[in-house]
Amino acid sequence: MRVDLQPAYILHARPYRDTSLLLDLLTPVYGRITAVARGVRQSKGHKRQLLNPFHRLLVNWQGKSELKLITGVETDHHYLQLQGNALYSGFYLNELLVRLLPEQDVITGLFERYEWTLDALHRGEPLEPLLREFEFMLLQGLGYALDFLHDCHSQQPIQSGYFYLCDIHQGFYSVPADSDPRFWIAGAHLLAIAAGDYSAADTRRVAKQLARLLFKPLLGKRPLKSRELFTPGSPH
């Protein structure tokens, strides 16, 4: 199979054999693919300079197996120079996708959300809402999203003035009388997250805790390396 001029972002690059690179690419049509860029490690030319993260490429490849061979790379001149926590956030998104997105598994709208998030990071928009929205979309695409609007036991709407507990496999349910208040989640925060409203610091804190809780069984015991780049109290 031959594919021409497919938009792509490099999520990860690692040495392959003596002179090549093994690339994880995110594409809108084929999802995440793994491809070999032959000979680029010994090249100092234009092609090698293109193979950097946060640079939207137009890629040609061929191959019937899961491992593709890159036959051409062009730029569409959309390159984002991220810095500081915005750069680390970009690395965090890339690592999440490499770790969790199965090869050639297409999640509708994920490429566009990824690109939009990078653009927003470049513009200097607040990090936490951007990361949480991306995380929750990825969880939904992977089949692990929770319903923030309904009690998973009673199916009644979440109430702003009530408190809930989280079951990562089922959702949120009203707190039993004998439950530990340390784990209570205000319904107001759940409704705010569902609406994409992260204006309150407590909502941002709860959203971050929930995202970590939901990703934990998917990521396993191996920690995300990109988290080591952030300072304590950062939005990752």
Swiss-Prot record:
Function description: Involved in DNA repair and RecF pathway recombination.
Family per record: Belongs to the RecO family.
Organism superkingdom: Bacteria
GO annotations of cellular component type: bacterial nucleoid
Protein name per the record: DNA repair protein RecO
PANTHER family: DNA REPAIR PROTEIN RECO
Keywords from the named record: DNA damage, DNA recombination, DNA repair
Gene: recO
Single Gene Ontology BP annotation: DNA recombination
Organism: Cellvibrio japonicus (strain Ueda107)
Cystine connections: none
HAMAP family recorded: RecO
InterPro entries: ARFGAP/RecO, DNA_rep/recomb_RecO_N, NA-bd_OB-fold, RecO, RecO_C
